[in-house]
Amino acid sequence: MAAAAAAGANGSGGSSGMEVDAAVPSVMASGVTGSVSVALHPLVILNISDHWIRMRSQEGRPMQVIGALIGKQEGRNIEVMNSFELLSHTVEEKIIIDKEYYYTKEEQFKQVFKELEFLGWYTTGGPPDPSDIHVHKQVCEIIESPLFLKLNPMTKHTDLPVSVFESVIDIINGEATMLFAELTYTLATEEAERIGVDHVARMTATGSGENSTVAEHLIAQHSAIKMLHSRVKLILEYVKASEAGEVPFNHEILREAYALCHCLPVLSTDKFKTDFYDQCNDVGLMAYLGTITKTCNTMNQFVNKFNVLYDRQGIGRRMRGLFF
């Protein structure tokens, strides 16, 4: 209302103000300060980027991805430490989260990271829109006051394209409406994360940066295998052309190809068979020992339950004997 009044008073300058107001997303709350302090780990950003890149490679076009945020919360301090992907379906142009998949993944993460809890969800794209509100309401059915993180992988800015929001309820036109309030966040890193981020930073897209020893070794191996493949393919094409009579026989080249084939390791020797069978027996024995251990554990649980049941029945008999 105040913006409209200012627009009417200022004439042409007011129309400019109305355009600015129209550009503000309708799902954003204005004049609201964050109620929590957020510390974001680089691992979360790397996970989201990897998730988006894999989906873009599989689909051949940029895709919106959705996942869960996990970490720790102490009072008003929230530390987002990790994330995992979520399954979603589109029904009538609305995104529906697969909650059964979420509960399965949550149980798996609880077995490994018992101290971490579900904090919210993430997605990719531009500024928040009503579709994000729709998904956020579904997440609110799982936990109260979840965080919402949005990463824009298509931005051209040099700043980190990550925004964190919390939901607030505002009265608009007499109705309670859910809106997003942006939160400020800080980056928190551990030693392992610093090493990983430094390694990724060195691996630039142009290759002009300093590469790690492992990366250089893998690149050299890839180049050598690629060269070997092209040379073997050339020899094979020459042999086929010679057999078909398309090119004259060159006995020197054929002898060299024959000698090259005999340089390959022979896998039909007795020593290879002995080592191969020994390794197979070792693997089979390890699997067998694992099965025996699991069976013993099951039997132990059965015996414990049987003993508990037997003790209860014995106590019941003694108690009945006392009454008689």
Swiss-Prot record:
Pfam family, one: MitMem_reg
GO BP field: protein deneddylation
Superkingdom in the source lineage: Eukaryota
SMART domains: JAB_MPN
Gene3D superfamilies: Cytidine Deaminase, domain 2
Keyword Nucleus: yes
GO molecular function: metallopeptidase activity
PROSITE patterns: MPN
Compartments reported by the entry: Cytoplasm; Nucleus
MPN domain mapped to chain residues: 38-171
Main location: cytoplasm
Signal sequence range: none
Keywords: Cytoplasm, Nucleus, Signalosome
Cited InterPro entries: EIF3F/CSN6-like_C, JAMM/MPN+_dom, MPN, MPN_CSN6
GO CC annotation: COP9 signalosome; cytoplasm
Record-linked PANTHER family: COP9 SIGNALOSOME COMPLEX SUBUNIT 6, EUKARYOTIC TRANSLATION INITIATION FACTOR 3 SUBUNIT F-RELATED
Family: Belongs to the peptidase M67A family. CSN6 subfamily.
Quaternary context: Component of the CSN complex, composed of COPS1/GPS1, COPS2, COPS3, COPS4, COPS5, COPS6, COPS7 (COPS7A or COPS7B), COPS8 and COPS9. In the complex, it probably interacts directly with COPS2, COPS4, COPS5, COPS7 (COPS7A or COPS7B) and COPS9. Interacts with the translation initiation factor EIF3S6. Interacts weakly with RBX1. Directly interacts with COP1 and 14-3-3 protein sigma/SFN. Interacts with ERCC6.
Protein task: Component of the COP9 signalosome complex (CSN), a complex involved in various cellular and developmental processes. The CSN complex is an essential regulator of the ubiquitin (Ubl) conjugation pathway by mediating the deneddylation of the cullin subunits of SCF-type E3 ligase complexes, leading to decrease the Ubl ligase activity of SCF-type complexes such as SCF, CSA or DDB2. The complex is also involved in phosphorylation of p53/TP53, c-jun/JUN, IkappaBalpha/NFKBIA, ITPK1 and IRF8, possibly via its association with CK2 and PKD kinases.
Protein name in UniProt: COP9 signalosome complex subunit 6
The organism of origin for this protein: Mus musculus (Mouse)
Taxonomic lineage: Eukaryota, Metazoa, Chordata, Craniata, Vertebrata
